[in-house]
Design a protein with these regions (language model features):
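Long C-terminal interaction/binding lobes of large macromolecular proteins
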Residues: 9
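Beta/alpha (TIM)-barrel catalytic core signal, keyed to glycine-rich beta->alpha loops juxtaposed to Asp/Glu
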Residues: 86
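Conserved nucleotide-cofactor-binding alpha/beta core module
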Residues: 90-91
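Surface-exposed amphipathic alpha-helical tracts and adjacent flexible/coil segments at the periphery
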Residues: 1-3, 15-52, 61-65, 73, ...
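Basic, amphipathic alpha-helical recognition segments used for DNA target recognition
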Residues: 69
Length: 356
């Protein structure tokens, strides 16, 4: 989790946010999903009490001590078990029900069949992740960041160690020589996209879908929510529809790491789950550069996607990003270009390497 780096709510803004949601008929949930130290418990209780008084609809928790206290003192306050609790089987869900929880956010590591089995055998509300970043380890249980970066993922300070570049070596036990097998972002998972499984999950009895959006832009939240809401409503109305290419493209454009993964929903093989070429947003594939004039700062290429002045582009194997400020077709400046147009992009000054 990277929650410690987010712009979190203070008391006043929390109250305003809850009111903002209420007047728009939207539920507001507060996340207190971390394991607490003794000296932190009172602050957590105080925050939960304020949220309760402000009219919060539910609190998402991981710490069983905090959950027990909240259930005893605020029995009408719905408690949701965080995915950080690693609820991965039916017995765990049944235990949570006895402890006073009303909903369980299941581990992201479960398959469709496992989710269906749990839903079929409990009356408890079940929530599952359908979109966003995945952990290479069990969510909330990874000590990788703590071990090599001294930053606890569980405490909200994940160093994103799985997003770093690594070299896989094979050592010959007899000669003691090492051979490089692979190099890249070998532990970096693609983002989850469960759009194609919504109907099956709804039929299974899943109560709520969760979108991972920590540290994402408002555009990301709006785009992903809009698209998932559209297909959920279609299914609930009895008119499920095929995923439109434009919707898939919008999801890719707003954020993707080398395309999407179906994660553990269909027990995807690790080779498909991980994208070793780049750990950050890839955007859409624009095309292959056919000509690069470093002195004039010009690049030419046939477009695979539309492009316009103000769009941001990047290059494979490069970290820098560039805003398009000059766009030409046949030496004439244009505000935008369509897919399959051959364009020249100007003013491309900077540390650009031309890979052949």
């Amino acid at each position: 989790s990277a929650r410690a780096f987010a712009s979190n709510f203070d008391d006043l803004n929390l109250k305003k946010a809850i009111h903002y949601a209420k007047v728009r008929n939207v539920k507001a949930h507060l996340t207190l999903n971390t394991l607490l130290k003794d000296e932190e418990l009172q602050d957590a209780i105080s925050l939960a009490q304020k949220a309760y008084e402000y009219g919060i609809d539910a609190i998402i928790v991981q710490d069983l001590g905090l959950a027990t206290f909240l259930h005893e003192h605020f029995p009408d306050l719905p408690l949701h078990a965080s995915t950080q609790m690693t609820i991965h089987r039916l017995e765990g869900v049944k235990k949570l029900e006895k402890l006073g929880f009303s909903r369980a956010v299941l581990s992201r590591e479960l398959s469709l069949e496992e989710i269906e089995h749990i839903c079929k055998n409990t009356k408890m509300e079940i929530e599952v992740f359908v979109h966003g970043a995945l952990c290479i380890s069990y969510s909330g249980q990874c000590l990788f960041s703590s071990s090599i970066g001294a930053r606890s993922g569980n405490r909200g300070k994940c160093a994103q160690s799985c997003r770093m570049s690594y070299t896989l070596l094979e050592k010959d036990v007899e000669t003691n020589k090492e051979k490089t097998l692979d190099t890249g972002y070998l532990l970096s998972p693609r983002d989850l996209c469960g759009l194609e499984y919504l109907e099956r999950l709804i039929q299974a009895g899943v109560t709520c879908f969760k979108i991972e959006g920590r540290m994402k832009t408002p555009e990301y939240v709006a785009t992903v929510t809009r698209i998932y809401r559209k297909y959920i409503d279609n299914i609930l109305a009895g008119h499920p529809k095929e995923i439109a290419p434009k919707d898939q493209e919008d999801l890719l454009q707003v954020f993707n790491r080398g395309g999407f993964s179906t994660g553990h929903l269909n027990s995807e093989a690790n080779q498909d789950l991980v994208f070793p070429q780049k750990p950050s947003n890839m955007g859409l594939y624009l095309g292959n550069v056919s000509n690069f004039n470093a002195n004039k700062g010009l690049i030419s290429l046939p477009l695979n996607e539309p492009l316009a002045i103000g769009d941001t582009i990047s290059f494979e194997k490069e970290e820098s990003k560039y805003m398009v400020s000059e766009l030409m077709i046949q030496n004439k400046n244009v505000p935008k270009a369509n897919s399959k147009d051959r364009v020249t992009i100007g003013r491309m000054k900077g540390n650009i390497r031309y890979w052949r």
